[in-house]
Every structure is written in C-alpha cells, then in structure tokens.
From Swiss-Prot:
GO terms for molecular function: DNA binding; DNA-binding transcription factor activity, RNA polymerase II-specific; zinc ion binding. This is Xylanolytic transcriptional activator xlnR. Residues 176-188 have a biased composition (Polar residues). It comes from Aspergillus niger. PROSITE patterns: ZN2_CY6_FUNGAL_2.
C-alpha cells in the first residue's frame, strides 16, 4: 500500500474535500466530534475559518462569490447527490458537496433565535488554560476565586502554523555560535547572572517583599525567556539530526544554566519549590544525578513526551516510573490525563516568578517546603499549615499536653518547626507523617465533608509517607546505585547489597540515610497503627524504629563539641539562631572516634534523648500489651541524660536544665509523658523481666523458688514506693505552693510557654484561672500516676492472664498476695474515679491508659464472678467505675478489646446486683471464651490478635 502524498493527506481532512475522500472519511472522522459540533462556539469558529480559507484559496473575487453563493444554496439539496456533483465543475466539487460542517451550521442557524450565543472571550487565564476549564476572562476569574488559585495571564501568546524560516534560521545561527567556543562566556554570564539574582532582596526568604523590584524583574524577563526558548528549539532540532554532538553541547549549556531559570516550578496551581532549598536533604530523597546537573531537570524536561515533535528518550521528566525526580520536583505525571486528551506540559512562560524565593508571601510555615510538591495533589497548602498547628496544639494552657491522641510526647520544639524564617530542616517523610497524624483527628472542613474525605486523604498521606521513607531499606534508591553497585557489595564473600548496606555504613560513621527524622517517622506510623485494630502489624514499625535507634546509638551521649574562639565582632545572641536552625541531619553521625570534631547543637542532642526515651517507654508498654520481652535494655542508656522539662524544652531554656541525672528515672518529675509516665515504664521493665523469667520453660520454676526471686521482687517494690513518694511531693509542689502564691521555685512553669502553645492564653485568661488550671492538671497527672502505680503492684504480685485467673487451678485467691493485689485493685478503681472527675473523656493519655485499665480490672472481674451477690460494696463501686471508664475509652480511642471487656464487665456487674439469668452457666462460659482471645500465658500475644 503506497503512502499518500502530503496534498492528498491534507485534502482528506479539509472541509472542502473531494467526494471520494468525503465518503470514505466522514463517518470515521466526525464520530467523536458530533457532540462538539452541536455547540455554537465550535461551529461559528469553523465557519469563519472556512470563509477565510475560501477567500484566500480562490483565484479571484468571482470565484469566492460563486463559492459563497453555491454554499448558501446547498441547504435545500440532498447531502450526497452524486449526479449534481458530476454535473458541477471539478474546481467547485468540494464546495457544492453537503458535509457535516454545513449541516451543523444549518442546525445552529435554526436554533440561534432560541438559544443566545455566548460571547467568546479572547484569552483564558493560565490556570483555566492548563486545567482545560471554562474561563470568564476576568482577572481574577470565577474559577480561580472559587478554588483559591492564583489567576494570571502570563503565558506566552502563540500563533498557529509553522515557525517562519527566518526565525528558524536565527535560532540555528544562535545555537551554532553558542557551540563554537562561547560556552565559557555563557558559563560566566549565566553564573554571574545567577549570583546577582541570588543576592537580590526579593529572593531572600528572610527579607521583605519589594513590589517595585518584582514588577521590574518580571517585565524584563520575557525577552530572556524568549531567547532560552529559541535556543531550546534549536537544540531539539540538532538532537534529531546529530544526537551525539547535540547531546554534548546541550549538556554543557544546561550545566552552565545550573537550573537558574527552572529551579522553581508551579504546576497546576501547586506552590513552587526551590531546588536550592533541597540541597540539604538526605541523599535518600535527592535526585540520582544531583541537583547541580540540569540535563534531565532542565527546561527541556518540560517538553511533553506525548507530543510527536519531542524526542523519544531524552528530556522526559513527566513519567514518575522512568524518572523518580518527577514527583520530587512537583511535576504532574501524564497519567492524570486520559490517553485521548494529551495535556502538554505548561510553557515556561507560565512561571513568572522563577527567580523569587518560593512561598515567601503565601507559605505560613516554610518548614513545609520539602514536602509541598508531594502533597500538592492531596491537600491544600493552607490545610497543611493548619495540620502542623494541630500536631503541636496543647490541650492545656498551663502545661504541655498534646491534643492529638496519636502524639504521645513532644520530640521536637514547636518554635523550631513553625519559625517564619529559619525553621528546622526536616525530611519530607517526617513532615508527611506529621500531617498524616494530625489529619486523623483534625476537624477541618476539607477532611469532614464529604464523610469519606478523611479516609481518602489519610490513605494518600500514608502512602506518601511510606514512599518517602522507603521502609526497612536504608540504601540507594532505584536509579541511584551505580552499575557496579552489586559487585561492590560483595565483601568477604557476603553479598550485602540486598540489605541496603552501603560502603560508608561499614565504617565508623553511619550514613545520613538513617537519620533521626526517619526514626521519628517510624514512631508516627507505629503509634497510629498500634491504636487501630491492627496492633500486631504495628510491631513491624516499632521494630524498625528500635533497630534504627540502636544503630544510631541514640542511647548514648554525643561527645562534646570542639570549642572555637568567638570572633571579636560576633554577638552572643547567635546561639539562638543556631538553636532554631541546626545543621542538616547531623544527628545521624556522631558515633565512632572520627566524630569528635562534629558540632551538634544542644537542641539536636535533646531531640536524640527524647526520641530514645520515648522508644524506651513504648518498648516496655508494648511488652505488657503484647506479652513480649524487652528490646531496649537499661544498660544501653545508663549514661544518657534524662529528658528535660517540657516547658523548658519548648522555651529553649537549655541552661536551666543543665543539671540532670543520667540513666532511666524512677521518680515523677513533671507533667509530661517524660515526667510521670517514663519512670513508671522503667519500673515496668523490671516487672516484665521477672514475668518472663518466672514463666521460662526450663529455669522458671527454679527461679520462682529461689531467694533471688524474693530479692528482685523487693527491689521492684522499693522502686514503686519511691515513685509513690515522689508523686506526693510533686503534687504538693505544684498545688500547695501555687495555692499560696509561692511560685518563685518554678518561674517558667506558669505561662512561660504560652507564647507558642496557646497564643491566646495570656490575653484571654487571668493569672488566677491559669493557676487553677495548673492545679487541676497536676491532680489529673497524680491520679493517672496513682492508678498505673497500683496496676504495677498487681502485675508484680498477681497473674496477667484473665483465663488462668478465673480458673484458679493453683488456689491463688486464698494466698496473702491475692489479698494485697485485691487492695491495689480497689485503689486503682478509686484512682480511676478521680481520673473521670478531672478528665471525663479520658483524653489525657488514651494511647497508653487502656492496657492498665484492663489489667487493673481483671481482679474485680474475678471477685464479681466468684462472689456474685456476696461482693462488698467497695467491690461493686469499683466495678461500676471500671465500666464507666471503659465506656469513656471506647468514645475517645475506640478499640475492640475495650468494647469486648466492657460487655464482659457489664454482665458480671449485673450478676453482682442479683440479676442472674437463666442460662447462668452459659454466660460464664461465654465470658471465658471472650477473654480467651487475649492471653498472657504460654505463647499468648496479649492484645495483638
């Protein structure tokens, strides 16, 4: 089959094609355009184009006139009258034939009187043009106002048809001149231009916005952009004719450009992102070619790979599968548009603010810059800032208490993240996980309407977090590894490449891929999963966090910094800037003999400590929840300083916390999780060790009957008594002194951190109300600490497994230890009643409190099951309190085991009150079957179903 010539190919698509072509092409070419042809805009536009074509194509005016006359008479003729076509001259055969365009035009004329014709706007805004949305032509347009987009008319006006030979010749000459020895001058000029642009005040994130400079810079930019566009066109033509030569020349030119004009992109209304701001990120998230190489991330990457004129394998940045930097740089993947409607990448003229620092005027929290390109298609920029506020929101104005149930303790300073000019430099994975945690409970309208919005957004943020983290494999990403990477990873006959072990990790120092930010990201993922119904799956994330923390040696203090003599003109206040803006991920280094010369800020040191102690506490807490041995040992952190007071930490007063003890604490020292809950977890670790030693299949019985057992139990009991005394001293210090007005001993506790935790605290509350709230907060902490302390007494003396407790094969209920444990069970119930008084919805520590409420209730269930109507009034009141507490827990943090035990306890309480059902035996058997789901004996996994 021969290929048709160009005139034949063109005439087959002409509105005045010959009869043979029309009959063959009309049915197939107009099927997809039937609905489009019915619209008045389309028909009128095609009518005007056909008239212009007829006027220019005819030889004289008579021909044009006869053509118009013949077309005006065709509305009364049959659509395909072959006899008429044959009798007509061949020169006018196209015009006399009835075609779909004329039919559609006739239909429009018939209905034009009933339907008003909407006036066509001359130009749509950049957003509507890129989104293919109808625009009203206003500035700003209605569409941009409705969706909060930036309405601009900055894109380049393009003309239809081929470029003129004069323009192509000029472009080729410019490209030839640039490739014949002028690359050095181009480098110098471009680098000088970049240096001058970087030093301008409009580009500084800390500086003020200069509108005069902005207008001048934008007005002078189109000419430069036109030159770059011309050079790009010529480079593309040369790449098709001489690939090897053009590739080298283009690579030199683009390297010289250094991403000067395309280092910020604003795709589909998403915020721009500066490449220079990404140089400090860990290598795990950086592009494989580095940020200085502009070959794959240059202006030529904006060419749409689906266009027929673009190269096949070069300059493609739209496909995330072929180039992992596409989502990192904020480009929309081509998969967003269907194959039948290819949307070209936006023209460089769509980005008028290339040289300006991104987000300088719109981003409330610049700390979000690394993650904004990834979340632009998930949540708005304003919502991301609001979610960051939610993450750091405190439920109390007197002392720090995270409002989100999934934020178990503050690892980072709020001021470091929310600083307007010098925020903490964070990995995108950490920021995405923080937004994901906050989105679980945020009441933003974007997440609540429709009801499925929260689940959809949270799922996308979760997938993004895991994708940015690359879990469990801290090695080169896809495309980062060199061709001989696998060969290099065979060391001493062992292949290490598959485990993500890079060469620098085999030395004294760990690479920056295993950073503190990654550990915190694991903690966020594990916390939310632990609070869900998939508790067993959370151990994967906790194990990763514990392993990476141990690898980074977070349980050890870093060596002291090298002292440098302060310059004469250096101010003493520079330390505050260093505290707010620490070096990038320097905390991932610092173990080994070669790290003594690394300077680490005190804030980074405290972040390492708080992260370790949080993992230390959750390790012991989950050992009780899931009936598993400890992972992090006391000897690993024997020389680590205890975490500082949360109020001092948020203020940044490191000098006031200079004198601290080392090692795991056993006394209550503060209102935060680190102050009252961490000491309890230290004691719980000893109880867990005793429990597993007692139940050891070989040595358990001998150890249980040895004097060493009694000594260990006495040691743990002494620690619990020490904690009880410190709890009373803590209550007296923060209630009696505040009541008497003697607040000199703790000057920073009252309102010192209100500047950054509750902005309206000072203006809306009086000193008296803050003192009252501080007293209530202190008593609530004491109530929680008292309850958990009683539960630890029960765990030390009693049985953990509810089925073994109810069956009582060894007659433990007749022993003295049972009487002691029962008294602690009643005391725990009384503390729970006090907790419900100060915290009715149990929202103070819902993540931790559930298991201690459950373990403290087993003995009361045993008493209700055995004694029934003979139970004492104190036991009945304790059972009622436990039922109310479980109902409150179900409302705050709904989990299956709490709902199940509430039903079991409610059934037992009904029997105590004399309401014994007819199937009493079946009720007892059903309770045991339900409790058998949660076993702490043998190979039982506790709450991890």
């Amino acid at each position: 089959m021969s290929t048709p010539s160009i005139p034949q190919f063109t005439s087959s698509f002409s509105p005045f094609s010959s009869g043979s072509h029309s009959t063959g092409m009309a049915p197939s070419q107009t099927v997809g355009l039937d609905t489009l042809a019915e619209g008045s805009q389309y028909v009128l536009e095609q009518l005007q184009l056909s008239r212009d074509a007829a006027g220019t194509g005819a030889g004289d005016g008579a021909t044009s006139t006869s053509l118009r006359n013949s077309m005006s008479h065709t509305k009364d003729q049959p659509p395909f009258d072959n006899e008429k076509n044959q009798s007509t001259g061949s020169g006018f055969r196209d015009a006399l034939q009835r075609d779909p365009l004329v039919e559609a035009r006739s239909a429009v004329r018939k209905t034009s009187s009933s339907a008003p014709v909407r006036r066509r706007i001359s130009r749509a805004c950049d957003q509507c043009n890129q989104l293919r949305t109808k625009c009203d032509g206003q500035h700003p347009c209605a569409h941009c106002i409705e969706f909060g987009l930036t309405c601009e008319y900055a894109r380049e006006r393009k003309k239809r048809g081929k470029a003129s030979k004069k323009d192509l010749a000029a472009a080729a000459a410019a490209a030839t001149q640039g490739s014949n020895g002028h690359s050095g001058q181009a480098n110098a000029s471009l680098m000088g231009e970049r240096t001058s642009e970087d030093s301008r005040p409009g580009q500084d994130v800390n500086g003020t916005y200069d509108s005069a400079f902005e207008s001048h810079h934008l007005s002078s930019q189109p000419s430069h952009m036109q030159h770059a566009s011309t050079a790009g066109i010529s480079g593309l033509h040369e790449s098709q004719t001489a690939p090897s030569h053009s590739q080298s020349s283009l690579g030199t030119t683009i390297d010289a450009m250094h991403l000067n004009h395309f280092n910020t992109m604003n795709d589909s209304g998403r915020p721009a992102m500066s490449i220079s701001d990404l140089r400090s990120l860990p290598p795990s998230v950086l592009p494989p070619q580095g940020l200085s190489s502009g070959y794959n991330a240059s202006a030529f990457a904006l060419v749409n790979p689906q266009e027929p004129g673009s190269p096949a394998n070069q300059f493609r940045l739209g496909s995330s599968a072929e180039n992992p930097t596409a989502p990192f740089l904020g480009l929309s993947p081509p998969g967003q548009s269907p194959g039948w409607l290819p949307l070209p990448s936006p023209s460089p003229a769509n980005f008028p603010s290339f040289s300006l620092h991104p987000f300088s005027s719109t981003l409330r929290y610049p700390v979000l810059q690394p993650v904004l390109p990834h979340i632009a298609s998930i949540i708005p920029q304003s919502l991301a800032c609001d979610l960051l506020d939610v993450y750091f929101t405190s439920s109390s104005s007197s002392h720090l208490s995270p409002l989100s149930p999934y934020v178990v303790g503050y690892i980072f300073r709020k001021q470091s993240f929310l600083h307007p000019t010098k925020p903490r430099i964070c990995s995108p994975g950490l920021l995405a996980s923080m937004l994901w945690v906050a989105a679980q409970t945020s009441e933003a309208a974007f997440l609540t309407s429709p009801p499925s919005a929260r689940g959809r957004v949270c799922q996308k943020l979760l997938e993004l977090t895991i994708g940015l983290l690359r879990p469990l494999v801290h090695g080169p990403a896809t495309g980062e590894a060199s061709p001989n990477y696998a060969a290099n990873m065979v060391i001493n006959g062992v292949a290490l490449g598959g485990f993500g072990v890079s060469m620098d990790q085999l030395g004294a120092q760990s690479s920056a891929t295993g950073a503190v930010d990654d550990v915190a990201t694991y903690v966020h993922l594990a916390t939310v999963v632990s609070a869900s119904e998939y508790k067993a799956a959370s151990m994967r994330w906790w194990t990763a966090a514990w392993s990476l923390a141990r690898e980074l040696k977070l349980g050890r203090e870093l060596p002291p910094n090298v002292s440098h003599a302060r310059q004469d003109g250096e101010r003493d206040g520079d330390g505050e800037a260093d505290k707010r803006h620490p070096p990038t991920l320097i905390t991932s280094l610092g173990h080994g003999s070669g790290s003594s010369g690394i300077n680490v800020t005190e804030e980074e040191r405290e972040e390492r400590r708080r992260l370790w102690w949080l993992l230390y506490a959750t390790d012991r807490h989950l050992a009780l929840c899931y009936n598993r041995p400890l992972t992090l040992l006391d000897k690993e952190c024997g020389g680590l300083l205890q975490p500082m007071n949360d109020d001092l930490w948020q203020v940044g007063d490191f000098a006031a916390a200079a004198y601290r003890q080392v090692g795991p604490p056993v006394e209550c020292t503060g209102h935060s999780m680190y102050g009252y809950f961490l000491p309890l977890m230290t004691i719980l670790g000893g109880i867990v060790d005793l429990h597993h030693a007692e139940n050891h299949p070989r040595f358990g019985l001998a150890f249980r009957n040895s004097p060493e057992w009694e000594r260990q139990v006495l040691d743990v009991t002494r620690q619990l008594d020490t904690y009880g005394r410190s709890l009373k001293e803590f209550e007296a210090r923060y209630t009696s002194n505040l009541t008497l007005g003697a607040t000199d001993n703790e000057p920073v506790v009252e309102g010192a951190h209100l500047d950054h935790t509750s902005p309206s605290g000072r203006s809306s509350s009086t000193v008296g109300s803050r003192v009252s709230e501080s007293i209530v907060h202190t008593r609530m902490v004491v109530a929680y600490g008292t309850h958990i302390m009683h539960v630890l007494h029960i765990l030390l003396a009693g049985k953990w497994d509810p089925v073994n407790l109810l069956e009582d094969h060894d007659l433990w209920i007749s022993s003295e230890s049972f009487v002691s444990a029962m008294s602690h069970a009643v005391g725990a119930a009384e503390a729970a009643a006090e907790i419900l008084e100060y915290d009715p919805d149990l929202s103070f520590m819902p993540f931790f409190f559930g298991i201690y409420l459950l373990q403290g209730s087993f003995l009361l269930l045993l008493a209700a099951d055995k004694l029934q109507g003979d139970a004492s009034p104190s036991v009945v009141r304790a059972c009622e309190t436990i039922v109310r507490a479980h109902e409150a827990c179900v409302v705050t943090l709904n989990t299956e085991y709490q709902r199940t035990f509430r039903k079991v306890m409610r059934s037992a309480l009904a029997q105590v009150r004399g309401r014994i059902p007819e199937d009493f035996g079946e009720q007892q058997q059903r309770r045991r079957e339900v409790l058998a789901l949660y076993r702490w004996s043998g190979d039982g996994s506790g709450l991890a179903l």
